[in-house]
């Protein structure tokens, strides 16, 4: 009975804590994206939410284990249940073993998902969502104003249907001045009669009758592969820290915490240390 109770409490509180932390982080992210959310299709937005919450709930499992372990030990001490356990010859070691069962469950699941749930996949989903918004944005650029989206700055004096006239276009080190500009979709811009100015080391000016610029050609495939590998390393470290913080949380909560504030202080300390470890690993990659 005690084993089942501990399993239920730790699993429920760990998942709930991890999910709440993922929602807090999501709220901060949505605050940054608030100016573009209304233009994103509902289906794509929901897909982003699912991927985000799946990854960050997984990522915050160590925090969930830390807090749920401290809360469980605090509950046992506040209710004087430890003395009851001792009277039935249930030792600290046996309680530790009971707590280890849900911990091992989380550890094994986290290890199995370490190559699947990746931070870079969340970033890719966000970029894909913004790319679809970009399609709508560039197709409806108003005339007479300077507008920017990501690394692109665009201005046109007039608009006729899908064609912009007397256009100014800047992307990174490339500036294009053209009489006509049409957005073809999928990141492709088609210019007619104008000038291309590049700014790599020296300025180069080239006149053209027709010029096509594909923004996707500037995407770096090797960089994405590198980030995928880095995401896997972060997951491995995250999983590897689980046994340490579970053991420390159980031991400290059982032996050294006697007042309400001490539980929160030690739990907060362990969470900060865990995030510092992840931060340092990311800096080293």
UniProtKB/Swiss-Prot annotation:
Organism: Aquifex aeolicus (strain VF5)
GO cellular component: plasma membrane
Membrane topology, from the record: Multi-pass membrane protein
Keyword flag Membrane: yes
Localisation: Cell membrane
Regions that span the bilayer: 7-29, 49-71, 95-117, 137-156, 232-254, 259-281
Subcellular location, principal: membrane
Protein name per its UniProtKB record: Uncharacterized protein aq_539
UniProt keyword annotations, A-Z: Cell membrane, Membrane, Transmembrane, Transmembrane helix
InterPro entries: LptG/LptF_permease
Pfam families membership: LptF_LptG
Signal peptide extent: none
């Amino acid at each position: 009975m005690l084993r089942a109770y501990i399993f239920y409490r730790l699993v429920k509180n760990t998942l709930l804590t991890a999910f709440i932390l993922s929602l807090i982080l999501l709220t901060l992210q949505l605050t940054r994206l608030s100016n573009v959310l209304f233009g994103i299709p509902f289906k794509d937005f929901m897909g982003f939410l699912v991927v985000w919450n799946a990854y960050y709930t997984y990522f915050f499992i160590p925090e969930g284990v830390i807090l749920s372990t401290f809360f469980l030990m605090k509950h046992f001490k506040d209710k004087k249940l430890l003395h009851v356990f001792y009277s039935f010859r249930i030792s600290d070691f046996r309680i530790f073993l009971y707590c280890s069962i849900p911990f091992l469950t989380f550890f094994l699941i986290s290890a199995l998902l370490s190559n699947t749930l990746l931070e870079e996949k969340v970033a890719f989903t966000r970029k894909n969502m913004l790319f679809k918004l970009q399609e709508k944005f560039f197709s409806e650029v108003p005339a007479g104003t300077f507008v920017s989206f990501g690394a692109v700055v665009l201005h046109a004096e007039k608009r006729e249907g899908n064609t912009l006239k007397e256009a100014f276009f800047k992307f990174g080190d490339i500036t294009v001045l053209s009489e006509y500009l049409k957005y073809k979709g999928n990141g492709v811009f088609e210019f007619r009669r104008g000038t291309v100015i590049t700014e790599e080391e020296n300025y180069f000016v080239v006149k053209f009758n027709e010029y096509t610029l594909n923004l996707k050609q500037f995407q770096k495939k090797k960089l994405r592969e590198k980030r995928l590998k880095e995401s896997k390393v972060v997951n491995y470290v995250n999983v590897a820290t689980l046994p340490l913080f579970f053991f420390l949380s159980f031991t400290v909560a059982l032996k050294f915490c006697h007042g309400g504030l001490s539980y929160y202080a030690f739990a907060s300390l362990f969470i900060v240390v865990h995030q510092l470890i992840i931060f340092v690993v990311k800096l080293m990659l």
